[in-house]
Amino acid sequence: MTSVVVVGTQWGDEGKGKITDFLSANAEVIARYQGGDNAGHTIVIDGTKYKLHLIPSGIFFPEKISVIGNGVVVNPKSLVKEINYLHDSGVTTDNLRISDRAHVILPYHIKLDQLQEESKGENKIGTTNKGIGPAYMDKAARVGIRIADLLDKEIFAERLRTNLAEKNRLFEKMYESTPIEFDEIFEEYYAYGQEIKKYVTDTSVILNDALDQGKRVLFEGAQGVMLDIDQGTYPFVTSSNPVAGGVTIGSGVGPSKIDKVVGVCKAYTSRVGDGPFPTELHDEIGDRIREIGKEYGTTTGRPRRVGWFDSVVMRHSRRVSGITNLSLNSIDVLSGLGTLKICVAYDLDGERIDHYPASLEQLKRCKPIYEEMPGWSEDITGVRSLDELPEAARNYVRRISELVGVRISTFSVGPGREQTNILESVWSAK
């Protein structure tokens, strides 16, 4: 048995989809365990770019099982659209499995998400307005509708009527907005349920059986550790647990069955939406990194905020997610910069701190303490081993590993599969 979890170690958009796709070549089952279609990952295969939001990256391997676990919140409309997109691209989805325990995102969740965000004014969180938060709220309040409910016409109708009555009171009384009618949702979403019915099953059984049979299972996280509702920059976070511990809850697999945790990061830092970002760049260097790195959100299209590599963030991610291996992406984006900076600690009111504060007020006062390193001018997109990197690039990679305290198992010098270089196989024995 070998199981590997892939987690983002920053604020999402670290290149998890690419690394998951790369590691999927040696996996037999690939599973997502949290999040929804607010997550976006881009995969490049033979020069063709594919953008997915819900379906695991492993779908491109027809002989492998791709699982949407119970911890994922599923928008049936988005899922059907994504399935059709794959079919139109010549990709089969016969290997897809969807948990019958996963919760469903419905139009009232999306509307509530938008209204809540608008009402916050300057205190907005920066939500993608996909209904993710309200769906998880309903789940916690025990009024959510699950995939199993969606497939049963009578149960779906009953629970939808009950939920709409409550949500419409909220829309009309609190937000002075128009209600959503039952007929606007019911037939359309029941039909979506019937379209995905053939994929629905108890995915916990599939995953545990695979592990018990000694198969290789890969768990794919969405977003990143710094967006985790418990360990991230609360309240500027997502509504689920991207940390590796989220696997046990969101997939129905016990913690004793997790072998390795691969933390994915960029050679710099990026963030979409609001919230603290100590190493953020507001100058021409930041603009250059954004343009060369194509730092625009897969889901929203919004320009991402960019900054220098932050080892304080990375050490926090290592601790709370139990990271055993590091996958370092986008090193090539830094080519051509004369001097590079790595944040090694923060200055908080004159005191050096090495940990990431929970207090947003303290974070606002934190100033990054930088270590400068020489850059490199060479084009490294064709590099296929660590030894081929310029000396300055090698030193930069090694310094990141030292500061984070985790060995690097892969590094990437571009978006293609062939541009991902293995230093150590995570599929080897413990």
UniProtKB/Swiss-Prot annotation:
It is found in: Cytoplasm. Gene3D superfamilies: Adenylosuccinate Synthetase, subunit A, domain 1 (3.40.440.10), Adenylosuccinate Synthetase, subunit A, domain 2 (1.10.300.10), Adenylosuccinate Synthetase, subunit A, domain 3 (3.90.170.10). This is Adenylosuccinate synthetase. GO terms for biological process: 'de novo' AMP biosynthetic process; IMP metabolic process. Belongs to the adenylosuccinate synthetase family. The keyword RNA-binding does not apply. Homodimer. Binds 1 Mg(2+) ion per subunit. GTP binds at residues 12-18, 40-42, 304, 330-332, 412-414. IMP binds at D13, E14, G15, K16, N38, A39, G40, H41, T128, R142, Q223, T238, R302. It comes from the Bacteria.
